[in-house]
Amino acid sequence: MLQLKFIWPVARITPIYRPFTSHPFRNLATSSSISSTKAKTTKTDTTPLKLSNELYAIFKIHNRPYLVTEGDRVILPFKLKQAEVGDILNMTDVTTLGSRNYKLVGHPINTSLYTLKATVVGKTKRAFQTREVTKRRNRRVRHAKSKGDLTILRISELSMN
C-alpha cells in the first residue's frame, strides 16, 4: 500500500495588492528605507538640453509610454473623460527628456525642469470593426461589433526651464 506524505511548502507566495496608478510599482521596503534616511539630491546640469533645439520626451498616460517631439500628434486608444476638445494638458509623468547627444532620465522627472503641454485636438471613434466569434464543435457564428474610442493630442510645447 502506497502512503502519501504531506510536505510543507518551503516558500509561500503572497499576492501583492495595489491600487491602479499611472506610476510603476515601487517596492515598499526600498521606498521606506529611502524616506527614513536623508536622500541626497544631486543638481543636474541641464544646459546642454536647454541649448538644444531638438528635444524629445517620453511621457506616460495610464502606464503607456509615448515618445514625442514638439508638434507631434498622439493618438490615445481611449477616451479622456476629463478633457474636452481645445483643453491644454500639462504632462507631469515624464520619464525621459533628451536631445541628439544628451539625455535626462528619471521616474518621473521633476516638473520644475521642463514644460510639456498638449492640446486636445479631437475625440473620435475607430473605424467600425466586425469579427466572427465561434466556439469549437458548434456551427453558430456570432458577429461581435466594436467601435473603440480615440483621443487625439497635439504636443504644443516642449521646452526646458
Swiss-Prot record:
Q: Where is the transit peptide?
A: 1-35
Q: Does the keyword Plastid apply?
A: no
Give the Gene Ontology MF terms in alphabetical order: structural constituent of ribosome
Q: Which UniProt keywords apply?
A: Mitochondrion, Ribonucleoprotein, Ribosomal protein, Transit peptide
* UniProt-listed GO biological process terms: mitochondrial translation
Q: Which InterPro entries match?
A: bL21-like, bL21-like_sf
Family, per entry: Belongs to the bacterial ribosomal protein bL21 family.
**PANTHER family from the xrefs?**
50S RIBOSOMAL PROTEIN L21 (PTHR21349), LARGE RIBOSOMAL SUBUNIT PROTEIN BL21M (PTHR21349:SF0)
Briefly state the protein's biological role.
Answer: Component of the mitochondrial ribosome (mitoribosome), a dedicated translation machinery responsible for the synthesis of mitochondrial genome-encoded proteins, including at least some of the essential transmembrane subunits of the mitochondrial respiratory chain. The mitoribosomes are attached to the mitochondrial inner membrane and translation products are cotranslationally integrated into the membrane.
Subunit structure, as described in the record:
Component of the mitochondrial large ribosomal subunit (mt-LSU). Mature yeast 74S mitochondrial ribosomes consist of a small (37S) and a large (54S) subunit. The 37S small subunit contains a 15S ribosomal RNA (15S mt-rRNA) and 34 different proteins. The 54S large subunit contains a 21S rRNA (21S mt-rRNA) and 46 different proteins.
Per UniProt, subcellular location reads as: Mitochondrion
Protein name (record): Large ribosomal subunit protein bL21m
